[in-house]
Amino acid sequence: MKNDVISPEFDENGRPLRRIRSFVRRQGRLTKGQQHALDNIWPVMGVEFNDAPLDFAALFGRDAPVTLEIGFGMGASLVAMAKAKPEQNFLGIEVHSPGVGACLASAEEEGVQNLRVMCHDAVEVLHTMIPDNSLNMVQLFFPDPWHKARHNKRRIVQPPFAELVKSKLKLGGVFHMATDWEAYAVHMLEVMSSLEGYRNQSASNDYVPRPESRPVTKFEQRGHRLGHGVWDLMFERVK
């Protein structure tokens, strides 16, 4: 795996562009299990960043619906979803290599075959490697809320990002978000509701109950015990 988690963007003259990122690089130490997974499973399930669009049928060895998860953390819920839906293909993107290693190790342990992972900036991957009109679902679960007002601009859910996601979804594809930070949930709802071409799947035009397809994380279980809320939003591409 290349150590290029964060790559610069360049303009037509080759000058680097400065872009506000929604994450902070926190690599941390790899456990032996994570390192083993990166050394041995990455060559099979890992996807290196490059400037060529992905051919999903070739990547997965079959033509099947594709779900993209952005920022999968340690990968437990992503692996669980891939295992629960073997008829679908899953691609996960995470910028922190310990999480990628943990996800790969879990996938091997669970015998999951329909999962591929990347260790790179998801926005660059979307721009460069994900073909337009190719995804059945995009998942963004518990992104950094950047709760301080001066940091709100770092939140990944902004109109340009949501428009980018829409361009990658097939007609009828769904952008599924979840957050445990109420102010961010309100922000997500405002952003998504302001855009043409999306339809809120909520009957009340705000939030949806957690679908069974999204596993409850350990962090989320702890939050429930403490009385914390979680907000799910699902917006369908309609044009």
UniProtKB/Swiss-Prot annotation:
InterPro entries: SAM-dependent_MTases_sf, tRNA_(Gua-N-7)_MeTrfase_Trmb, tRNA_methyltr_TrmB_bact. It comes from the Bacteria. Residues 150-155 are annotated as: Interaction with RNA. S-adenosyl-L-methionine binds at residues 69, 94, 121, 144. Substrate binds at residues 148, 180, 217-220. GO terms for molecular function: tRNA (guanine(46)-N7)-methyltransferase activity. It is an enzyme of class 2 (transferase). SUPFAM superfamilies: S-adenosyl-L-methionine-dependent methyltransferases. Pathway: tRNA modification; N(7)-methylguanine-tRNA biosynthesis. Keywords: Methyltransferase, S-adenosyl-L-methionine, Transferase, tRNA processing. The keyword Chloroplast does not apply. It catalyses: guanosine(46) in tRNA + S-adenosyl-L-methionine = N(7)-methylguanosine(46) in tRNA + S-adenosyl-L-homocysteine. The keyword tRNA processing applies. The active site is at 144. Its EC number is 2.1.1.33. One of its GO terms (cellular component) is tRNA methyltransferase complex. Catalyzes the formation of N(7)-methylguanine at position 46 (m7G46) in tRNA. Belongs to the class I-like SAM-binding methyltransferase superfamily. TrmB family. Monomer. This is tRNA (guanine-N(7)-)-methyltransferase. It comes from Klebsiella pneumoniae subsp. pneumoniae (strain ATCC 700721 / MGH 78578). The gene is trmB.
